[in-house]
């Protein structure tokens, strides 16, 4: 999310806590020095499945045949991507303007998987 204006006239970043939480989880993978040059970033977001994707009764642990693989609801891909790019800025690369190629996928988790995010960054 973008910065918001409060009733008292100041601005705040509603996603600041999310960015900090993400950075804390991935900091151990950060390079010793931020990457330089043109970069490619691939992001894969595994989203939780709603109960409506599952069968009922004794087969409630199985997915319906009609269950989609791709997540087409909010949050939007561009907002998720911006959150990750902003969170990793200055630690993984000098500036997110270095990201020349960006691929974002939003998929539903498979049975037994937890929601997660994969981040791949490489030089191009």
Describe the residue ranges of each PLM region:
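Acidic, proline/glycine-enriched N-terminal capping motif
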Residues: 1-124
């Amino acid at each position: 999310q973008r910065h918001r204006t409060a009733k008292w006239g100041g601005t705040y970043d509603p996603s600041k806590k999310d960015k900090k939480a993400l950075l804390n989880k991935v900091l151990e993978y950060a390079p010793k020095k931020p990457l330089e040059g043109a970069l490619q970033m691939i992001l894969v977001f595994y989203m939780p499945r709603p109960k409506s994707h599952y069968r009922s009764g004794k087969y409630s642990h199985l997915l319906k045949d009609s269950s989609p693989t791709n997540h087409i609801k909010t949050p939007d891909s561009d907002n998720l991507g911006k959150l990750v790019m902003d969170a990793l800025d200055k630690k993984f690369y000098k500036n997110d303007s270095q990201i020349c190629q960006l691929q974002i996928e939003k998929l539903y988790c498979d049975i037994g998987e937890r929601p997660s995010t994969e981040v791949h960054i490489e030089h191009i």
